[in-house]
Swiss-Prot record:
Keywords, comma-separated and alphabetical: Ribonucleoprotein, Ribosomal protein, RNA-binding, rRNA-binding
Annotated GO MF terms: rRNA binding; structural constituent of ribosome
Organism expressing this protein natively: Lachnoclostridium phytofermentans (strain ATCC 700394 / DSM 18823 / ISDg) (Clostridium phytofermentans)
Name of the coding gene: rplU
Pfam families, per database record: Ribosomal_L21p (PF00829)
Protein name: Large ribosomal subunit protein bL21
Biological classification of the source: Bacteria, Bacillati, Bacillota, Clostridia, Lachnospirales
Length: 102
C-alpha cells in the first residue's frame, strides 16, 4: 500500500514505515503530523484524486529537524572583476510514516 502526498510544494511517494525528508514543518521531534493532501492512493486498487482523494490522510511522526548540506552559489561577470559567493543550507523535517488512512 502506498500513497502520493503533497507538502511544501513537492510530492512524495510514501508507504508505511518510510522515513522521508520534507520541507520544514516547524514542529518539535516526537510530535504527530497529518498530511491531508493525498493525491493518489493504492491499496490493491489505484484511486486518483481530483485533485485530492476525499477522506484520505497520512499520519506521521517527526523524527528530527535539521539543515541539508551547504550549496554554494557563485556568480561572476567577466571582464569587470565582479565575483559573488554565497552559501545556502535548506531546512528540513525528517518524518516517519506511521499509517495511511484510506
Amino acid at each position: 500500500m502506498y500513497a502520493i502526498i503533497a507538502t511544501g510544494g513537492k510530492q512524495y511517494k510514501v508507504a508505511e514505515g518510510d522515513i522521508i525528508k520534507v520541507e520544514k514543518l516547524g514542529v518539535e521531534a516526537g510530535a504527530t503530523v497529518s498530511f491531508d493532501q493525498v493525491l493518489v492512493l493504492n491499496n490493491g486498487q489505484v484511486v486518483v484524486g481530483n485533485p485530492t482523494v476525499a477522506g484520505a490522510s497520512v499520519s506521521a511522526t517527526v523524527v528530527e529537524e535539521g539543515k541539508n548540506k551547504k550549496v554554494i552559489v557563485y556568480r561572476y561577470k567577466r571582464k569587470s572583476g565582479y565575483h559573488k559567493k554565497n552559501g545556502h543550507r535548506q531546512s528540513y523535517t525528517k518524518v516517519k510514516i506511521d499509517k495511511i488512512n484510506a
